[in-house]
């Protein structure tokens, strides 16, 4: 079983992961929103831990669904967050996309933190990186954090700011990578 979000990797550029109608999510799918050259943005990925997660994403989300008092509210707000993100991508509004993305990330982690037993994927480096992203913003540079169910912090910023953001994050991470929107999935021969 793979990640449902992998459907976003089939197309290049900006892709929305849409729910399907099936309760088990097997008919979820990716829908292209814009080509890779639509917007000159970057995602700076700060890796703080290379090992496996203590609880896998599927098991963790099921635990959150069943036990977190915040899970339903997170789900209820997801459609509005996706709409705002879609609009931000269409209009190339980095601040709007960053704000909605970061808020959604913290809502998701709130559901995990309030699960029983709690799911705490964060490491000390994770918290240091989240503080550093806020400091970068306070210094006037557009940078917003996002995370999946794990300890790594990804930072959305303009492509022009990516190198500076990466340098600010480097002291708190074991590795920092700068990624840009790419093309569609392709098979390559060895």
What spans do the regions from the language model cover?
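C-terminal nucleotide
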Residues: 33-190
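Gly/Ser-rich oxyanion-binding loop with an adjacent helix/lid
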Residues: 1-40
């Amino acid at each position: 079983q793979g990640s449902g979000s992998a459907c976003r990797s089939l197309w290049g550029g900006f892709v929305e992961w849409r729910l399907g109608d099936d309760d088990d999510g097997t008919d979820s799918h990716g829908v292209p929103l814009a080509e890779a050259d639509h917007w000159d943005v970057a995602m700076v990925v700060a890796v703080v831990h290379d090992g496996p997660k203590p609880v896998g994403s599927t098991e963790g989300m099921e635990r959150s669904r069943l036990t977190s008092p915040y899970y339903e509210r997170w789900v209820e707000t997801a459609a509005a967050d996706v709409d705002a993100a879609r609009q931000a991508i269409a209009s190339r509004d980095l601040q709007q996309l960053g704000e909605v993305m970061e808020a959604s990330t913290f809502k998701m982690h709130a559901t995990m933190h309030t699960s029983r037993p709690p799911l705490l994927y964060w490491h000390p480096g994770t918290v240091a990186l989240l503080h550093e992203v806020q400091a970068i913003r306070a210094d006037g540079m557009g940078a917003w954090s996002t995370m999946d169910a794990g300890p790594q912090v990804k930072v959305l910023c303009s492509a022009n700011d990516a190198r500076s953001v990466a340098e600010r994050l480097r002291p708190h991470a074991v590795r920092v990578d700068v990624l840009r929107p790419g093309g569609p999935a392709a098979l390559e021969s060895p």
